[in-house]
């Protein structure tokens, strides 16, 4: 009789243990869904990123949007969700964000579209997505609004696919290193600065700012142990082939190819560009030595860049793959930040007026030059005039939305700018998180320079290039760090 009672007790104990274990799974279960979609535009198409109009009639590589849905389920608390969408675009205009959300609502009303976090890889060989920058021909070229519609419908469908594919999974993270970005602003003995300025002249003094050589990676697995997605944070825009007149995803394309060959043909790869408004893959010095090494390896610059990132990711993977976590709590905060806009001075206003007069004179002599001068006339100089008139009534402010996502002991934070690297480093240094992933261009862009850069001048730091100045940059850092540290 005693044996029977002991057996009953043992069986009951097993059921209790299983119940407790299953409750833990339900309470903190991590569910992951992924998808990838081709967002290559129909040709011919105008290209975004340069000051002049370029019309592409050739596709060198496809463009992609990669989606990862992460959900932390709990039977005692509200489920937390974040939907990351990384796009081979120059920026993410507000019109595109709203259009994608609207399309997702139509086909998947169960999805809370406020959880969508989009970012651009900042390729300069992708379609124009921002209105008012170029004199795009009305006939024979893909129109911006048509691409918006095409992109939004395809991306929304891919979001639904990722949402519907959610299954239990695991995640881990790690840190590697590779020199990808190079600070592209040279300073001189007269205290001036220049983007892509010469460094092999006696007047050259130093490279202006910092570089961030961290390669931070998130790895996502399914229950079978297959790697199904990665998120790779590199503080360098994808602009190695930026001057070409073709469709090209830049270094992310060969990197994705290498990663899919190494891990999984269906691997989703989130390309997260870190704070790198003053960075570029272009070398500022040491070009001959770099070229020699590439020739010895028999590869081009795109392969060299992707090779370095792959090496950092693989090295990180080998170290952290045994630390997969299935029960990671997620906190997703969406915050509105109000920043002071940069004030247009009288001298800046007068300078822009003079430049506009020069451009108008050029156009009278050669009306066809509008294709090359439209952006300078309408946006670059023209917006300065509009801002000067507008600020007479009220001090201008810039409102923007940022996302802060805590996953375990790491955090991801976004901003809409081409944010100079020193701001991103400050966020990482002051954050209480084990690792802090900073994602720029989670919005429409414009440079956000440091005070040193503004004093040095030139493109990326002058009034024409910026809506928000260094005081706004410091406030962005302070508020982002506060949001992060409140989660820890």
Feature locations, PLM:
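N-terminal secretory signal peptides that target proteins for export/translocation
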Residues: 1-6
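A compositional/structural signature marking long, glycine- and acidic/polar-rich segments
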Residues: 7-10, 245
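Bacterial N-terminal signal peptides
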Residues: 10-20
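Sec/Tat signal peptide C-region and signal peptidase I cleavage site
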Residues: 22-27
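Conserved beta-alpha junction segments in alpha/beta enzyme cores
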Residues: 28-268, 272-275, 279-304, 310, ...
């Amino acid at each position: 009789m005693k044996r029977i009672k002991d057996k009953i007790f043992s069986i009951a104990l097993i059921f209790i243990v299983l119940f407790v274990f299953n409750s833990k799974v339900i309470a903190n279960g991590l569910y992951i869904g992924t998808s990838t979609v081709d967002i290559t535009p129909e040709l011919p198409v105008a290209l975004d990123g340069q000051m002049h109009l370029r019309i592409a009639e050739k596709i060198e590589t496809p463009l992609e949007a990669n989606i990862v849905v992460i959900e932390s389920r709990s039977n005692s608390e509200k489920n937390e969700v974040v939907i990351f969408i990384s796009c081979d675009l120059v920026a993410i205009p507000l019109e595109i964000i709203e259009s994608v959300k609207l399309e997702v609502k139509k086909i998947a009303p169960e999805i809370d579209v406020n959880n969508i976090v989009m970012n651009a890889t900042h390729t300069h060989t992708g379609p124009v997505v921002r209105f008012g920058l170029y004199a795009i021909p009305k006939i024979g070229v893909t129109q911006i609004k048509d691409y918006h519609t095409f992109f939004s419908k395809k991306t929304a469908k891919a979001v639904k696919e990722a949402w519907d594919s959610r299954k239990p999974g695991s995640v881990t993270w790690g840190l590697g290193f590779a020199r990808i970005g190079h600070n592209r602003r040279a300073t001189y003995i007269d205290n001036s600065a220049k983007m892509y300025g010469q460094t092999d002249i006696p007047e050259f003094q130093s490279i202006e700012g910092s570089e961030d050589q961290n390669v931070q990676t998130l790895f996502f697995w399914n229950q079978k142990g297959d790697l199904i997605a990665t998120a790779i944070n590199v503080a360098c825009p994808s602009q190695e082939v930026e001057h070409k007149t073709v469709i090209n995803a830049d270094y992310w394309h060969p990197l994705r190819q290498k990663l899919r060959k190494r891990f999984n043909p269906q691997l989703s790869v989130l390309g997260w560009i870190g704070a790198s408004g003053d960075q570029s893959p272009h070398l500022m010095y040491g070009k001959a030595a770099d070229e020699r090494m590439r020739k010895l390896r028999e590869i081009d610059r795109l392969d060299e860049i992707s090779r370095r990132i792959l090496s950092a990711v693989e090295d990180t993977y080998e170290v952290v793959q045994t630390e997969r976590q299935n029960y990671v709590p997620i906190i997703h905060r969406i915050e509105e930040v109000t920043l002071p806009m940069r004030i247009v001075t009288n001298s800046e206003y007068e300078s822009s007026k003079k430049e506009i007069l020069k451009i108008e004179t050029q156009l009278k002599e050669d009306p066809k030059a509008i294709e090359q001068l439209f952006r300078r006339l309408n946006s670059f100089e023209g917006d300065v005039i509009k801002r000067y008139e507008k600020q007479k009534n009220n001090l201008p402010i810039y409102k923007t939305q940022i996302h802060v996502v805590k996953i375990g002991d790491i955090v991801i934070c976004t901003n809409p700018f081409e944010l100079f690297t020193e701001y991103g480093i400050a966020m990482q240094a002051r954050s209480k998180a084990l690792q802090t992933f900073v994602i720029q261009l989670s919005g429409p862009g414009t440079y956000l320079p440091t005070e040193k850069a503004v004093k040095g001048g030139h493109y990326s730091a002058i009034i024409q290039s910026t809506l928000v100045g260094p005081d706004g940059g410091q406030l962005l850092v302070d508020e982002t760090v506060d949001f992060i540290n409140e989660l820890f």
